[in-house]
């Protein structure tokens, strides 16, 4: 009797672990903007303590950006999106690799490269939201 009481009445499915529906590449972009801004600040400040703190924060922000891209890739984008945008797998992969390069560098160009890839992913994301 209890099993019938607690049995689901309606079967539902979700695209992620929790069907919140809140996805946005802006999260990755903001973290990547932080990476680039930190790289620029590092170039203008040679204080050792600042450099160490900036390096730690830059690496954390790059990891967060990579995480947000991974969530988009694994939870938001679905097979129909990859069929419509066959370059999407490569774009996400290149963006993540660019963020890894930015972690290992103080050159703002590496941060900008990650931002450029994220901008392309953002464009595709919003096109899929219109569909």
Swiss-Prot record:
Keywords: Antioxidant, Cytoplasm, Metal-binding, Nickel, Oxidoreductase. Its cofactor is Ni(2+). Its EC number is 1.15.1.1. It is an enzyme of class 1 (oxidoreductase). Changing residue 53 to A: Loss of activity. Its main location: cytoplasm. Changing residue 31 to A: Loss of activity. One of its GO terms (cellular component) is cytoplasm. It is found in: Cytoplasm. Coiled coil: none annotated. Residues 1-14 form a propeptide. Pfam families: Sod_Ni (PF09055). Ni(2+) binds at residues 15-16, 20. InterPro entries: NiSOD_sf (IPR036502), Superoxide_dismutase_Ni-type (IPR014123). It catalyses: 2 superoxide + 2 H(+) = H2O2 + O2. This is Superoxide dismutase [Ni]. The lineage of its organism: Bacteria, Bacillati, Actinomycetota, Actinomycetes, Kitasatosporales.
């Amino acid at each position: 009797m209890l099993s019938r009481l607690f049995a689901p009445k309606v079967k539902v499915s979700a695209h992620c672990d929790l069907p919140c529906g809140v996805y946005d590449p802006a999260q990755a972009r903001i973290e990547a903007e932080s990476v680039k801004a930190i790289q620029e600040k590092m170039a203008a400040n040679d204080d050792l303590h600042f450099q160490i703190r900036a390096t730690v924060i830059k690496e954390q922000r790059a990891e967060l950006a990579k995480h947000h891209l991974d969530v988009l890739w694994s939870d938001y984008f679905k097979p129909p999106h990859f069929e419509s945008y066959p370059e999407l797998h490569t774009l996400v992969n290149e963006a993540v690799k660019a963020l890894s390069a930015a972690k290992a560098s103080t050159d703002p160009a590496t941060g900008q490269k990650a931002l450029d890839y994220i901008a392309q992913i953002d464009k595709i994301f919003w096109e899929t939201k219109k569909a």
